[in-house]
């Protein structure tokens, strides 16, 4: 139930980005070429982990900053660079949120930022987007592939800025990043669900 609620929150934030967005996913070819800045207020990095095999427990990170270079005619030129404040982590339990920021988990005091930097972007049939790159978390850098699709594009009716929104999914193994408390009983595989909104920089 928690996972479903967070997933709904992550995806729903993009549904009203554009008054011109179609009911079906728009074509990546419709996106304007240029450099985009992350709309931090509407970008969330959700995660889900098996809680001792009983439930899938979810939380999210917020406050991401960074840039996205888009060239629809030449996807090989696309580039994504994101920085995430680790202490932005939030769950439905305040005590757990505080624990996750501590030294036994993400240690946000020592490692205040996580980052993702793409190395290649490919657009496949049907507009499926594959992003390869490196995730740096807890002082460790590992490869991470994201599978994304365009959610919407157009002028945001509130900010009046040209905006594009994507949803992306990926998986990491937390022990690879030195976050190993209670492993393997507490799930090692972490599923990522990312809602990303980006505003064209004039």
Residue ranges and their predicted role:
Residues 1-5:
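Positively charged n-region of N-terminal signal peptides that target proteins for export
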Residues 21-202:
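Low-complexity, acidic/polar, glycine-enriched regions of mature
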